[in-house]
């Protein structure tokens, strides 16, 4: 199967898949499978992330997949497919997370890696469980306005602020090989980062990122992660809401879109084994700019996967 050629069919035509990739609902033997996770039952504020995968795919036809001054296109280097969406109940979070974990585990038994597009961040715990099942305790690069290492709220076990706490508690993550970038804003309690820091996670706040810059932060990531299998999770709210307004919990003072894309180039120096781009809520977007950025982030991650796993780059 091949991508839809934009010189044959205009970019606004045909049924939208991520970056016009072929659709294969039962993928086998691919380098990276793109999978949608349309769910927002873990959202604590503004809903709408369940519509994120649909919006991202719709805008992703804009992106060709051949970067300037990069030589061969991403899809000339790795074999990718869009497998559609995971069928997730909107009524029960425990069932949704279990369903996502089972589906993602199945993908990794037949394919090398996945890029999950969401959907709220609660589903990342399902991804971590699936990837750790294959690779053991993971290094993690986590871009977000929030640490997402909160305890459970409102009597439930999960929400979109808990995935990395579960990941550390369940030993899916090696916290000594985890870096969080872009953390900022207001929190319910002054000890909101104590859990992450107390377990050895390197937290780079948005203010510290401003001091380190892209290069200094990338060096820190390379040093912390090394060549361990690494999962990369991007919450779109890491970006300043001036550039990514379409999200559920926006936080002013974030990174520029250009800074995020530049920082992700260091992923090609690592050993990536899975990705997600989460928390796009198109209900609050303007002109599709958040979904376009989410596509660019996904495209960058796919290219960096190719760079990490293909020696000719």
Curated annotation (Swiss-Prot):
Residues reported in the UniProt entry to bind Mn(2+) 1: 121, 144, 148, 235
GO terms of molecular function: agmatinase activity; metal ion binding; proclavaminate amidinohydrolase activity
GO biological process: clavulanic acid biosynthetic process; putrescine biosynthetic process from arginine, via agmatine
Binding site for Mn(2+) 2: 144, 146, 235, 237
PROSITE patterns reported in the protein's UniProt record: ARGINASE_1, ARGINASE_2
Organism superkingdom: Bacteria
Cofactor comment: Binds 2 manganese ions per subunit.
Keyword entries, A-Z: Hydrolase, Manganese, Metal-binding
Cofactor(s) needed: Mn(2+)
Record EC number: 3.5.3.22
UniProt pathway: Antibiotic biosynthesis; clavulanate biosynthesis; clavulanate from D-glyceraldehyde 3-phosphate and L-arginine: step 4/8
Enzymatic class: hydrolase
InterPro entries on file: Agmatinase-rel, Ureohydrolase, Ureohydrolase_dom_sf, Ureohydrolase_Mn_BS
Catalytic activity reported: amidinoproclavaminate + H2O = proclavaminate + urea
Quaternary structure annotation from Swiss-Prot or TrEMBL: Homohexamer.
Family to which the UniProt record says this protein belongs: Belongs to the arginase family.
Protein name: Proclavaminate amidinohydrolase
């Amino acid at each position: 199967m091949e991508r839809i050629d934009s010189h044959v069919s205009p970019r606004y035509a045909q049924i939208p898949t991520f970056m016009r990739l072929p659709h294969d609902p039962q993928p086998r033997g691919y380098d990276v499978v793109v999978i949608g996770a349309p769910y927002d039952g873990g959202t604590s504020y503004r809903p709408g992330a369940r519509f994120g995968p649909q919006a991202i795919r719709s805008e992703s036809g804009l992106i060709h997949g051949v970067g300037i001054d990069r030589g061969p296109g991403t899809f000339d280097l790795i074999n990718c497919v869009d497998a559609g969406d995971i069928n997730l109940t909107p009524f029960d979070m425990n069932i949704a997370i279990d369903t996502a974990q089972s589906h993602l585990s199945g993908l990794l038994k037949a394919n090398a890696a996945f890029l999950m597009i969401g959907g709220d961040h609660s589903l990342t715990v399902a991804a971590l469980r699936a990837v750790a099942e294959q690779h053991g305790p993971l290094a993690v690069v986590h871009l977000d306005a929030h640490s997402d290492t909160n305890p459970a709220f409102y009597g439930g076990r999960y929400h979109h602020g808990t995935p990395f706490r579960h990941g550390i508690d369940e030993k899916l993550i090696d916290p000594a090989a985890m870096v969080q970038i872009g953390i900022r804003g207001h929190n319910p309690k002054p000890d909101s980062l104590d859990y992450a820091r107390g377990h050895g996670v390197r937290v780079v706040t948005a203010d510290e990122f401003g001091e380190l810059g892209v290069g200094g932060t990338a060096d820190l990531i390379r040093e912390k992660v090394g060549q361990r299998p690494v999962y990369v999770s991007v919450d779109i709210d890491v970006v300043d809401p001036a550039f990514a307004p379409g999200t559920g919990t926006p936080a002013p003072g974030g990174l520029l879109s250009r800074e995020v894309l530049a920082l992700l180039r260091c992923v090609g120096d690592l050993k990536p084994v899975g990705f997600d781009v989460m928390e796009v809520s198109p209900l609050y977007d303007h002109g599709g700019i958040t979904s376009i950025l989410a596509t660019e982030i996904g495209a960058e991650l796919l290219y960096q996967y190719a760079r990490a796993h293909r020696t000719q780059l």
